[in-house]
Structures are given as C-alpha cells and as structure tokens.
Amino acid sequence: MPTISQLIGSERKRLTRKTKSPALKSCPERRGVCTRVYTSTPKKPNSALRKVARVRLTSGFEVTAYIPGIGHNLQEHSVVLLRGGRVKDLPGVRYHIIRGTLDTAGVKDRRQSRSKYGAKAPKD
C-alpha cells in the first residue's frame, strides 16, 4: 500500500486489459478471404471433426475461424465476415464466421435459433 507522499510523486498505473480478439482491431466484425478450409479435431475429452477456415483479414491478420452450423458452402477464396468468440475445445480458434452474409450461405432447414445461423423463415 503506497503512502500519500508516494502517490503525490507518481499516480497509480491504470490496468490495461488484453483483448481476446486482437485481429478485429476494436471492430465488431471484420471481412476476410478464406485461404484454406479444413476440419480439425478437438481437445482431449471430445471427439469430432470441427469445420474451420484459415482467413486473411482486411486488418492484415491471418486467423483461424470456426464455421458454425451443419453443412457449409465455403471454399478457398470465399469472402467471409468474422466476429469474435472462441471455440473452447479448439486451441487457437478465437473467431466465428457469420453465416448468411457475403459468400457464406445460411444453414439449410434450420427452425430454431435461425438468426444465429442466417436461416430464412420457413415457408409453411
């Protein structure tokens, strides 16, 4: 605990928080181009083939992003929109691709949580 004299000499240092999504550069979303689309296996207790893409962003970063939902139409050179949000069981994946924008199609036949997957309202 500093004394009053010490505080007069120099003020308290502000704590700087480290961002969890540095590639977005304080923007809510970023556009990018897929350089590689592939599957990755999750960490120890889980087992799956998670769909991920390597994306070169307009901010100059190249990051790994998760493709949510069942089925996708992404391939190399697809233009995508990225948001923050990590995938807990995939190390190094700190971004999500937004479905239903730019070259990314929405999830087909999605009935619930449609807005999160870019799915249109069902016809019936």
UniProtKB/Swiss-Prot annotation:
The record ties this protein, via Pfam families, to:
Ribosom_S12_S23
Q: Name one GO cellular component term.
A: small ribosomal subunit
Q: Name one GO biological process term.
A: translation
| Annotated positions of the 3-methylthioaspartic acid modification | 89
- The answer to whether keyword RNA-binding applies is yes
Keywords on record? Methylation, Ribonucleoprotein, Ribosomal protein, RNA-binding, rRNA-binding, tRNA-binding
Disordered, as annotated region: 1-28, 104-124
Fetch the PANTHER family from UniProt: 30S RIBOSOMAL PROTEIN S12 FAMILY MEMBER
In terms of HAMAP family, this protein maps to: Ribosomal_uS12_B (MF_00403_B)
Q: Which family does it belong to?
A: Belongs to the universal ribosomal protein uS12 family.
Q: How does it assemble?
A: Part of the 30S ribosomal subunit. Contacts proteins S8 and S17. May interact with IF1 in the 30S initiation complex.
State what protein this is by name: Small ribosomal subunit protein uS12
Q: Which gene encodes it?
A: rpsL
